[in-house]
Amino acid sequence: MSDLDEIRRKRMAELEARQAAAQGQMQQQAQQQMQQQEAQRQFEEQKKALIAQILTTEARSRLANLKLTKPELVNQIEIQLIQSAQAGSLRGKVTDEQLKVLLRQIAGQKREIKITRK
């Protein structure tokens, strides 16, 4: 019986070690995920602050309304505006009219699918 007890004890110790390693790995993954979320939040805050500096109130309002329906398009426009501002190609704040022109340009770049029925 002592051999059987010894095998059981070794097996139990092995299982406990595996479980402890798995828990440590899960904690590390959770911590990494939290760090990524924090970095994403900081990026969004910085982007929001830059957009507030670049756009007029009316243009920001238009962009916020558009974000509800087309978030990918708004993200693309925000990135383009930030890059233009960092490159120094923007003079002053972007007005609502200038934003409309930019929206038309980007919307015109999309492929248009036309279906005709016969």
UniProtKB/Swiss-Prot annotation:
Pfam families on file: dsDNA_bind (PF01984)
Annotated signal sequence range: none
GO molecular function terms attached to this record: DNA binding
Residue stretches of biased makeup (Low complexity): 18-39
InterPro entries: DNA_bind_arc, PDCD5-like, PDCD5-like_sf
Superkingdom of this protein's organism: Archaea
Residues covered by region (Disordered): 16-39
Keywords: DNA-binding
Intrachain disulfide bonds: none
Protein name: DNA-binding protein Msm_0708
Organism of this sequence: Methanobrevibacter smithii (strain ATCC 35061 / DSM 861 / OCM 144 / PS)
